[in-house]
Amino acid sequence: MSDGTAAMGKKGRKRVHIRCRRCGRHSFHRRKGYCAACGFGRSKRLRSYNWVRKKKNRT
């Protein structure tokens, strides 16, 4: 009788993300096997999107 609702709260104690080998940030997901910051393990190219950078104010 220990696999019920009370045991579900004890699942979040392990480290989900570890340090990435490519970018060095603490964003490499251990179970998924790729970095959330740079995309290492998922693609050869560096993960970058335009919505991450702040847009220039051209008025």
UniProtKB/Swiss-Prot annotation:
Binds 1 zinc ion per subunit. It holds the Pfam family Ribosomal_L37e. One of its GO terms (cellular component) is ribosome. The keyword tRNA-binding does not apply. NCBIfam families: PRK04179.1. Binds to the 23S rRNA. This is Large ribosomal subunit protein eL37.
